[in-house]
Curated annotation (Swiss-Prot):
The keyword Cytoplasm is annotated on this UniProt entry: yes
EC number: 4.2.1.19
Name of the protein in question: Imidazoleglycerol-phosphate dehydratase
Species name: Chloroherpeton thalassium (strain ATCC 35110 / GB-78)
Pathway: Amino-acid biosynthesis; L-histidine biosynthesis; L-histidine from 5-phospho-alpha-D-ribose 1-diphosphate: step 6/9
A cellular component annotation (GO) from this entry: cytoplasm
Length: 194
């Protein structure tokens, strides 16, 4: 079976982004988002989802991190959606509970073709390194919107903000790895389409 791949670009007055990914990869990554902590989170997402990701972003981070973070989530969601094609044979659902030291995150995803985000996490710090923690929820919202998926994310407990954010990214990565897995040759929907 050929590997499922996608390439997406997005150029606005605020950002210039290119992404190439392979769903059936090994978790290889080359990520340059312009936001060091986001690089770390996307590298973790790639490694634990086993999705190969090459991403570059030039953005107006001198103004704020909002535009780059939002647009990266848009291209990541669009690229995964493109690589999934008609979603024939995918498991469709995935879930994971992942610890990161004292923090515990739960993720569930349905690649349903319908966008929705449930997010329950509280961060005690306004930033982790150069990432605004208020943008974590917005990243996942934009990802769900452009992936056309139901994503549920929550921190069950935790103290360290870095650990909470990383546990969210890793739990979604493991859930995604399960959801994109090919398990049959049928579309997993009574409608016949997803």
């Amino acid at each position: 079976m050929p590997k499922r791949r996608a390439r997406v670009t997005r150029k606005t007055k605020e950002t210039d982004i290119a992404i190439e990914l392979v769903l059936d990869g090994n978790g290889k990554y080359e990520i340059q988002s312009g936001i060091r902590f986001l690089d770390h989170m996307l590298e973790s997402f790639s490694k634990h989802s086993r999705i190969d990701i090459a991403l570059t972003c030039t953005g107006d981070v001198d103004v704020d991190d909002h535009h780059s973070i939002e647009d990266i989530a848009i291209v990541l969601g669009s690229a995964i959606s493109q690589a999934l094609g008609d979603k024939r044979g995918i498991q469709r659902y995935g879930w994971a509970i992942i610890p990161m030291d004292e923090s515990l995150a739960r993720a569930a995803i349905d690649l349903s073709g319908r966008s929705y985000l449930f997010f329950d996490a509280v961060f005690d710090r306004p930033t982790v390194s150069d990432l605004s923690t208020e943008m974590v929820e917005h990243f996942f919202f934009s990802l769900a919107e452009h992936l056309k998926a139901n994503i549920h994310l929550e921190i069950l407990h935790g103290k360290n903000t870095h650990h909470k954010v990383e546990a969210l990214f890793k739990s979604l990565a493991v859930a995604m790895r399960e959801a994109v897995k090919i398990t049959s040759n049928e579309v997993l929907s009574t409608k016949g389409v997803i």
